[in-house]
Each structure stands twice: as C-alpha cells, then as structure tokens.
Amino acid sequence: MHAVTKIFIIFIFVFILWTLYVENDITNRTRNTDNIDDLLESANRLERLLKFEAKKIAALAEDVHKIRANRKGKHVIMEEMVSQDLKQWKDPIPVLVFSCNRAMAVRDHVEKLIRYRPSQEKFPIIVTQDCDNENVKNEVKKFGDKVEYIKHLAGDKANITIPPSHRQYTAYYRIARHYKLALNHVFVDKGYSSVIITEDDLDISPDFFSYFSSTRYLLENDEKLWCVTAWNDNGKQENIDMTAASTLYRSDFFAGLGWMMSSKTWHELEPIWPVGFWDDWMRDPARRKDRQCIRPEISRTGMMSYGKEGASKGQFFSKHLAKIKVNDKYINFGKIDLDYLLPANFAKKTNLEVMKEAVELSIDNVASFVLSSENKGKSVRVMYDGNIDYIRKADKLHIMHDFKAGVPRTAYDGIVTCFINGIRIYLVPDRTKVSAYNPDWSVPPSFGE
C-alpha cells in the first residue's frame, strides 16, 4: 500500500472521530445557547485542520511523484551506461611501432605513446626493428619493460627477390617483408585480436588511444569496415573544421599512417601478402572488396620532421604531409554514440547533408561564396564528371588531387569533403557520367603531384 493511501485512510479516521466529537459537543452545547461562540470556534478549528491536512497530502503526493521520476531516470541512465559500456573494447590492443634506422625518431614517437597511454596492460607497445642499427635498439632498450622490442633478420641480409626493374624500390620490398613478420608476431605468436600500426616518424594526439579503443567495436560488428585510420589526407588546417574534433567519417580510401585492423582481416591477408608495395596492394579492389575505413575530421597522427628521411625520400612531405594538423584537444570518444558511423546510418546522414542541405554551385562561384561572412555555417556541393574535372576542382580547393585504384583520397561513395572559411564543401560525382570508381583514373604529369 502506497504511503499516500495510508495517510488518506488515517486522515479519514481522524476526521470521523473529530466529527463524532463535534456532534457530541454540539448536542451538549445546544442545551446551553450561551455557548454559540464555542461552537463556531470548533468549526473554525475543523476547517483549519482540513486545509492543513490537504496541504500535507499534496506535498506527499509530489514527493512520491519525484521519487518515481528519479527512479525512472536512473533506470534510463543505467541502461545507457550498460549499452555504452558494451561498446568499450575490453581486450588489449597492442601498438606495433615499425622502425629501422632513425634512433631519435623512434625515441620521440615512443615517448609520446607512453605519455598518452592510459594503461600498459590495455595498450602494450611493441617496437619492431628491421635494420641492424644499434642506436635504434639502444634507444628502445632505455624504455625498459614499458615496451617490448623485437628484431628479426634485417631485410638487406634476407636475400629478398626484387625484380630488376624495381631495384630503386628495394626499400618497399623490405618494408612489406617487415610488416608480414611483425604482424605475424602480433596475431600468431601473441594471439592478439587487433593491432594499432604506427611508424617511428609519426606524431600522435592526446586522444589517440581513446579514438582507437572507442571505434574498435565498429570493426567487430560491421563487415563493411576493415580499418580505422588516424589520418586525414586533406587534414591541413585551412581545409578542416577546427571546431569538429569529435567528427568522424567512413571512407573508401585506405590511408594508413596510424591505423587499426583486426586479427580476422590479417588472417585473410597474410596468405596472399605481397612482396612489395603493401599499401597500394591493399587499395586494389580485389583486396578492398568495397570495404571502408573510419577516419577523423582532424588527424590523430601527424608527420614529424623525420618523415622526409623515409623510404619515399620525402615525396609529398613538404607540400602535404608536413602540413597535416594533429588534433590537440582530448576527446573522450567513449562518451560519444558512434553508431552514426554504421553503414545505413552514415549513408542516410550523408545523403541528407550533401544532396538535400548543401547548395549546388559551380567551382568558380564557390570562391566568392566562401569569402562572404554571411555564408558561414552553410554547405555547398560541386559536381565533377571525370578524373580531369576532379583534379582541377580539387586543385582550386587546395586538397590532394590524386587517386589510388581510382579512389580519391578520403572519398566516401565518390564524395570528398573539406571545410574552408566556415563553409562545408563537397565534391560530388555526377552519377550520370561517373557511375563508380574507375581504377584507370590517374593524374597526368602536367598536373604535378
């Protein structure tokens, strides 16, 4: 029985007793007409008592209502907490750091990883070295038991078969071999279910680990995903929304440069792993199989100055890589519902933002549109009808204009987005002329890098 009901019964009982008392009092008092004042006083007392008890009952009813509402609210909050907790990946996610002969680079990179790492048990760091460089080994050993160091026969001593026409690309063959050996160590020897892959010339953001651990459940539950990357190829400060540090996207483009994959994906790729150029090999439609990656608006990795000394001899470094902005604000992705990145949700969201909310303009009109302060917060779309058209329009927006297996960098369903002067801009394929990605698309030499 509720408290209000009990109080009401007691009140009725008291009221009946009081009424009997008053009636008896009235009977006695009517014998004496001189006691009229006493009768009126009794009636007034009864009226005041009724008002007082009514207020008490109303107050108690309000308290009961609040208690019920609070219980319901706590129940909803608990359900949300349980739901979100189920999305937090419980298994360890090792960070596999690839190194060769840059001692200071690996020192700086590992220092950053340790500084931002919330737990050594959750995020063990494994540094794998390919070259016989004692300085690198010594720098890694200084970290003691904070990291694991692994070493195998160096690539220059492994008698790798390299086609005569590819002698100048020898480093890429050694790197592919290194990746296979190190990833087998993580997934076969150690038995981990996922890995974050980094290179010794990368800078990282304060929320690097939050980003990867909170997106891991997406990799597990979405068969259309095969990686989470920390890198935005168009992540120069003038091309991104600096207020959108928590914004993430799906992308058909495999970027690398700080990325995560599952053991399931590795067990698929390992038997057919290439002898060279592993990243372009992964971008091939035969391997990608229309799968996608998660990428951020603001990169969670950046390129340190050591990058210009890498295997690519600084290709793209000064013009693009060195200019990528690394996020400097901590975002707790564990408190954000990332289900909007699931395939159907993201497709619906993108269609709304691109085809319904954005205004269609020519690339020439976009230039004047972004200069007007009145247009801040608006979005526009620019259509393209082929690779040359895309290259020209990308150049006007100062974003990367190249393709890998026909996929523009950062593209999702052919759509490439950037953010300039407060305006969201979408480069969108004209589906009457561009039906799908074309692996034959390339950049003519006349357009440069």
Swiss-Prot record:
Keyword Ligase set for record: no
Membrane topology, as annotated: Single-pass type II membrane protein
Chain positions recorded as Mn(2+) binding sites: D201
Record pathway: Protein modification; protein glycosylation
Disulphide-bonded residues: C100-C131, C227-C293
GO cellular component: Golgi apparatus; Golgi medial cisterna; Golgi membrane; perinuclear region of cytoplasm
Biological process annotations from GO: protein N-linked glycosylation
Top class in the EC scheme: transferase
Localisation per UniProt entry: Golgi apparatus membrane; Cytoplasm, Perinuclear region
Claim: Cytoplasm is one of the keywords in the record: yes
Pfam name, any one: GNT-I
Cofactor annotation: Mn(2+)
Family that this chain belongs to: Belongs to the glycosyltransferase 13 family.
Protein name: Putative alpha-1,3-mannosyl-glycoprotein 2-beta-N-acetylglucosaminyltransferase
Gene, per the UniProt record: gly-13
